[in-house]
């Protein structure tokens, strides 16, 4: 599977809205364009036109990754993904795995701490170690879905990247690197203190991220209400 940057954004938005605003899903072209161009929870922020989103939908339809839905008394065509977790999909993800894939599609490379703090509306992780285990599982499948990037200078955590929207050679290189990744250790009660100390700086960062996410969620809630008003236009 090879997605362009725009196609990855479209799939990410459909995955996100299916979970966070199920009453407004599937999405009309207008609503999907607004979702793609959200100022919050997107990196990079885009300014796609409806024509560009429609072109991406057409290509995704050829790849059998989206489908149209119409009727029910409305003339507006709406779109839903077939990317994963449907009877037509080869990919089947748990709620935890889906949340991480969605975030990586929408926001690019991220650390486990960032993913934990940003995933609350999609899936609730109780600890960073749960995110790490999930990422490890996604990196070790027959066809790896994520890969661990080299640690940036002066950074504690590695960042992870999704492998659906990147070049084959790059993906193979990154995937090969993850084969040498050791599975994260599950913390035991007897070592809880050491684990907590190990993640102390990550938790401080997570607290700051949480405050930012509260503001982002308020913005996202307002955007969701706007999508609801425009979904039938």
Curated annotation (Swiss-Prot):
Coiled-coil region: none
Annotated InterPro entries: DUF480, WH-like_DNA-bd_sf, WH_DNA-bd_sf
Organism superkingdom: Bacteria
Skewed-composition ranges (Polar residues): 178-198
Disordered: annotated segments: 178-204
SUPFAM superfamilies assigned: Winged helix' DNA-binding domain
Family in the record: Belongs to the UPF0502 family.
Record-linked HAMAP family: UPF0502 (MF_01584)
Identification of the protein by name: UPF0502 protein Sden_2282
């Amino acid at each position: 599977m090879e997605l362009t940057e725009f196609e990855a954004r479209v799939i990410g938005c459909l995955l996100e809205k299916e979970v966070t605003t199920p009453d407004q899903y599937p999405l009309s072209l207008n609503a999907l364009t607004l979702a793609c161009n959200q100022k919050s929870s997107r990196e990079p922020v885009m300014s796609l036109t409806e024509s560009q989103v429609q072109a991406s939908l057409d290509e995704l339809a050829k790849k059998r990754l989206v489908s149209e839905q119409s009727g029910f008394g409305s003339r507006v065509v709406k779109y839903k993904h077939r990317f994963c977790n449907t009877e037509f999909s080869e990919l089947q993800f748990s709620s935890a795995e889906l949340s991480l894939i969605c975030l990586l599609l929408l926001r690019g490379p991220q650390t486990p701490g960032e993913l934990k703090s940003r995933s609350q509306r999609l899936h609730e992780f109780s600890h960073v170690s749960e995110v790490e285990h999930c990422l490890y599982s996604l990196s070790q499948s027959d066809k790896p879905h994520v890969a661990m990037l080299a640690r940036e200078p002066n950074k504690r955590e590695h960042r992870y990247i999704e492998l659906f929207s990147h070049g084959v050679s790059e993906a193979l290189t990154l995937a090969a690197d993850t084969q040498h990744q050791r599975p994260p250790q599950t913390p035991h009660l007897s070592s809880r203190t050491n684990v907590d100390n190990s993640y102390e700086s990550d938790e401080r960062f997570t607290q700051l991220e949480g405050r930012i996410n509260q503001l982002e969620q308020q913005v996202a809630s307002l955007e969701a209400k706007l999508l609801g008003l425009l979904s039938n236009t």
